[in-house]
């Protein structure tokens, strides 16, 4: 099993800095630069996936590589959702690491063994139907962090509520490792302290929050980053 370096992002996650991570609605450098300009700490992209919240299909590593190479020049931590049934090959994972990607994300139920041999830190996601046994299996992966992607699709875009926060708290109490919360619910600046209080290490802001344009990205991310900095 590989060992993973401590990075700016992993330190921020472990030390309570609440770094704001942005998941791009589409592979568009203008969106990425808008997110970074608004204060995003890290950027996440998708491969081999149909993204339900946007209706966007993300291509294979080979298809998306030109964009990934441009993205890698922006100088921020990078994460990749590697796919579902189809994921990058070991050789492609090596290239992603060489480009500067430091972690990969996938639903735990879609995990493939060769992913855990790569140089990318595993960040498996719990889903709506995940169990305590699934959580424990993630904890058994050396060096893993976790994503809590546990809202139902029917609830996407609704305000964050106490039921969501209670589930996050249950997960973070059991996990003992950094847990990232994706914005399946519509996170707003006032949610920052609530998420922190539930033990969440970082928010992952996706299209439900950011919209699909550079303008909407800046408008959404800037106040959430400001709120995160106020509560450090």
Regions found by a protein language model. Give the residues of each.
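Glycine-rich phosphate-binding active-site loops on the catalytic face of alpha/beta enzymes
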Residues: 42-53, 99-114, 145-156, 196-220
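C-terminal helical cap(s) of enzyme catalytic domains, especially alpha/beta-barrels
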Residues: 57-58, 160-161, 209-232
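Conserved N-terminal beta1-alpha1 strand-loop-helix module at the mouth
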Residues: 1-76, 139, 219-220
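Glycine/Thr-rich beta-alpha phosphate-binding loop at enzyme active sites
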Residues: 49-58, 135-169
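N-terminal active-site wall of soluble small-molecule enzyme domains
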Residues: 6-8, 51-99, 105-117
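Active-site mouth loops of central-metabolism enzymes
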Residues: 12-31, 78-88, 121-130, 179-189, ...
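Active-site/ligand-binding-proximal alpha/beta "capping" segment
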Residues: 150-203
């Amino acid at each position: 099993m590989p060992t993973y370096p401590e990075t700016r992002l992993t330190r921020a996650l472990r030390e309570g800095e609440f770094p704001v991570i942005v998941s791009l609605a589409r592979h568009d450098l203008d969106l990425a630069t808008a997110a970074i300009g608004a204060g995003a700490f890290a950027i996440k992209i998708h491969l081999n996936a149909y993204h339900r919240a946007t209706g966007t299909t993300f291509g294979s590593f080979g298809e998306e590589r030109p964009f990934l190479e441009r993205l890698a020049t922006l100088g921020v931590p990078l994460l990749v959702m590697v796919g579902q049934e189809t994921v990058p090959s070991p050789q492609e994972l090596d290239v992603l690491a060489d480009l500067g990607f430091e972690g990969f994300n996938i639903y735990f139920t879609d995990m493939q063994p060769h992913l855990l041999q790569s140089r990318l830190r595993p960040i498996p996601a719990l889903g709506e139907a995940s169990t305590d046994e699934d959580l424990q299996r993630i904890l058994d992966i050396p060096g893993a962090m976790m994503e809590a992607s546990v809202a139902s699709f029917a609830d996407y875009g609704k305000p964050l509520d106490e039921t969501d926060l209670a589930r996050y708290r249950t997960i973070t109490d059991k996990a003992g490792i950094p847990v990232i919360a994706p914005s399946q619910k519509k996170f707003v600046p006032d949610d920052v302290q609530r998420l922190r209080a539930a033990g969440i290490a970082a928010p992952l802001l996706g299209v439900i929050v950011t919209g699909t344009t550079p303008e909407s990205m800046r408008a959404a991310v800037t106040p959430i980053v400001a709120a995160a900095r106020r509560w450090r």
